[in-house]
Amino acid sequence: FGDHFGDLAPFCFAVTRGDAEAAFDAFVDKALPKFGDYQDAMLTGEPFLYHAVIALYLNCGLLDPLRVCRRVEIEWRAGRVPLNAAEGFIRQIIGWREYVRGIYWLKMPGYERSNFLGHTRRLPEFYWTGETSMACVRAAVNQTREHAYAHHIQRLMITGNFALLAGIDPHEVHEWY
């Protein structure tokens, strides 16, 4: 692993279904009630805030997307979480994650090679080092390197949006993510 981005230690993620379910349960109990208010927030020194941090478990099959959405719906129906928290979570899973997953299965493998805007610039070195005067980019890159995690706002609105506006080749962005 020596030449790869980031470090293997400390390692804090679940590797079994039971541990992934326990991590999701902890999110539901502790963070979901505030998720709706803070789902798009970034705060220095708080890499996870009120996020579920379950994409990796969904992606490798340790958690099922429909099952986690139904669990959140149950929490809302029972009055344990506000509507904005339940709606925000379910929308991100079904309305975004599953939509993008569907595009992947529909359009691959050619989709990976697409470059609609014809962007050709190389990915800047600061995506690997975090050495930039842009505080949000620096924080998102450093957090990704340190925790192997960045929430959707950091990926979409910080590192992704910078790459789009700067004309970075999407293949380089894909390889970085």
Regions found by a protein language model. Name each.
Residues 152-153:
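Generic helix N-cap/helix-start motif at coil->alpha-helix transitions
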Residues 159-163:
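Alpha-helical support elements that line or immediately flank enzyme active sites
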Residues 1-148, 165, 172-177:
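Catalytic cores of enzymes that engage adenine nucleotides and/or redox cofactors via long glycine-rich
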